[in-house]
Regions:
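Residue-level marker for buried hydrophobic side chains located in beta-strands
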Residues: 14-16
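Single conserved hydrophobic/aromatic residue that forms the stacking wall/gate
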Residues: 1-12, 314-322
C-alpha cells in the first residue's frame, strides 16, 4: 500500500494484493510459508525500506476467504457488508439480483470416474484452469438440461460460474478447494435439489465433446458442477463517498470486479489477465499506472489471483515462480 506524489501536490495511492500469498507454514517445506520460499527480490527490497505491520482482515466468525479479506482491505467491514461470495460475482457478470434471490458459485470441477457419484473423489477444483470459452459451452449444456423457473445458470470466467436460486435459502456448502483428494459424499449439499443437479451434471458433462477433446490433450475434464459460496444481494457504500477517492480496480476475477461494481469503482480490463499463473502481470501494472497518471483516479487496487490458485492446488514449487 503506497502513496506517491505526482506533481501539483496531488497524491495517488496504489495497493497490491497477492491473494493467498502468505498462507500457512507447510511441513513438507521445512515449516516455511510459500511466501518465504518464493524468489521475490523486489518485494524483499521494498520490505527493507517500508513500514510493516499485521492486519487482521478476517473476523473469527466469518469464513477465511478472498471475499471477506478483500472487502476488509478496501475498507468495507465484512461484519457489516459481507453477504456471501457469489452475490459479489453476480454484480460483475451483470446479474440483477432480487432481494429474494440466493446466488451460488457454480464451479466446473474434475471428479473421478467412480460409478457412484458419492464415491467420486474431487481431483481439481478448477478443471485444469479451463478456458472461459470451453467452460461457457459446458455451462450452456448444463443450463439446457437443468435450468428451470427456480434455478438460472450464468457463465463466468474460467471455472467460476454462477447460479441464481429464486426464493432460495442460504445453505451451508463446502468449497471444492477445501476437499481436494477426498471422496465427495459427505461434502455434498444437504439440500436435495442442489445435490441432484450436481449428480446429473456428471452425466451431462463427462462425455461432452469439449471434455473428450480435453482428455485427448491430457487435460482434466470439467465433468461436474459444484455449488458453494451462497449469499444474498449485496449493498456496498460508494467508494468515493466513503474514502474521498476515485477508485480503480485491476483484477481478472469476477469477485473483485463485482466488489468494484458494487462500490462504484472503475474496472480496468487488461488483455491477457486471466486470474492464473501466466496472467499479464505487466499489463495489470501499466493499467494501474495509466489510471493514476492519465485518468481521474486517485487510488488503484491491483489484485493478483495466481498465488491463491496455485496454493489451492497445493503446488509448492509453482507459486514461488513470480
Amino acid at each position: 500500500d503506497r502513496s506517491v506524489s505526482r506533481g501539483l501536490g496531488d497524491v495517488y495511492k496504489r495497493q497490491v494484493l497477492g491473494d493467498g500469498m502468505a498462507d500457512e507454514p507447510i511441513e513438507a517445506a521445512g515449516g516455511k510459508t510459500p511466501l518465504q520460499l518464493a524468489d521475490k527480490p523486489v518485494m524483499d527490497e521494498m520490505a527493507k525500506v517500508s513500514e510493516q505491520g499485521i492486519a487482521y482482515t478476517v473476523p473469527s466468525n466469518l469464513p477465511a476467504g478472498s471475499d471477506v479479506a478483500n472487502l476488509s482491505m478496501l475498507g468495507y467491514d465484512p461484519q457489516v457488508y459481507y453477504s456471501g461470495r457469489s452475490p459479489l460475482e453476480a454484480l460483475s457478470i451483470g446479474v440483477d439480483m432480487k432481494d429474494t434471490d440466493i446466488a451460488l458459485r457454480c464451479n466446473v470441477v474434475t471428479v473421478s470416474e467412480d460409478e457412484d457419484y458419492e464415491d467420486k473423489t474431487i481431483i481439481d477444483h478448477s478443471a485444469g484452469e479451463i478456458t472461459s470459452e470451453e467452460a461457457a459451452i459446458l455451462i450452456e449444456a448444463v443450463r439446457k438440461e437443468l435450468e428451470d423457473d427456480e434455478y438460472k445458470f450464468y457463465p463466468g470466467v474460467s471455472y467460476r460460474h454462477l447460479t441464481i436460486w429464486d426464493h432460495g435459502e442460504v445453505v451451508e456448502l463446502v468449497p471444492p478447494h477445501d476437499v481436494l483428494g477426498q471422496k465427495i459424499g459427505q461434502y455434498l449439499p444437504k439440500q436435495e435439489k442442489l445435490k441432484e443437479m450436481m449428480k446429473k451434471s456428471f452425466d451431462i458433462l463427462d462425455h461432452h465433446p469439449i471434455n473428450e477433446a480435453r482428455a485427448k490433450r491430457g487435460l482434466n475434464k470439467a465433468n461436474s458442477i459444484w455449488f458453494w459460496g451462497a449469499g444474498t444481494k449485496p449493498a456496498l457504500d460508494d467508494f468515493k463517498e466513503k474514502t474521498g477517492m476515485n477508485g480503480a480496480m485491476v483484477s481478472a476475477v469476477d469477485l473483485l470486479k463485482g466488489i468494484a461494481v458494487g462500490a462504484n469503482m472503475r474496472n480496468l480490463d487488461v488483455e491477457g489477465a486471466n486470474g492464473g499463473l501466466d496472467t499479464n502481470y505487466h499489463g495489470k501494472a501499466m493499467a494501474a499506472v495509466e489510471a493514476l497518471l492519465e485518468k481521474n483516479d486517485d487510488f488503484a487496487y491491483i489484485h493478483v489471483e495466481a498465488p491463491d490458485e496455485m496454493l489451492s492446488l497445493i503446488h509448492i514449487s509453482e507459486p514461488t515462480r513470480h
